[in-house]
Amino acid sequence: MRKGLFLLGATVAVLSSCSNQEVMDVADYANQPIEFSTFVGKNTRAGDITQTSFKKFWVFAQNKKVSESDWHNAFTNVQVNKISEGNWSPVNTYFWEANKEFRFAGYANGESQLDENIVSYDASETTTGTYTGVLTFKDYTTDGTNDLVAGMGNANDYTWKGDAGEAPAVEMTFHHMLSKLTFTFKTKMADTYDVD
């Protein structure tokens, strides 16, 4: 009887330690959802998109193993919605992956998603400056109703290296690529003319 109780106690202890480990793993950075924070830069006489009116954008993410050089799509042209001030979340939940470096790029075209043959992202391309990767707009046309803003989320090193704790929000700073402008002309001439 004592032997049976001892085995039962040992089994409970082993099972408890296994479930405790699973709970600890959930707290790791690598299992946390990818979230975003944004800032919209002000352009001189910029159009409609401002920090307060900015409600959604679309994002590309590519990742690679730290030890490799080939980048792969983590997600492509995914809508990200503003939940509250400083709190943004993609429509689908994506998680950080251990030992992978991530690079991000995003855009907003008013309330409209652009087709993937118009906008694309390649994290392996480099440009001058602090950001890496290139967000490309090809054959983009506008009807004049929207501002086009774009931003890169690569100012920080988004690589999980085994640390525990809270995962950082991806910082996206958007800049106006094309802005809707309104021109007002004033004249002292009469509104109507007589033609003889």
List the predicted regions and their residue ranges.
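Sec-type signal peptide cleavage vicinity
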Residues: 2-196
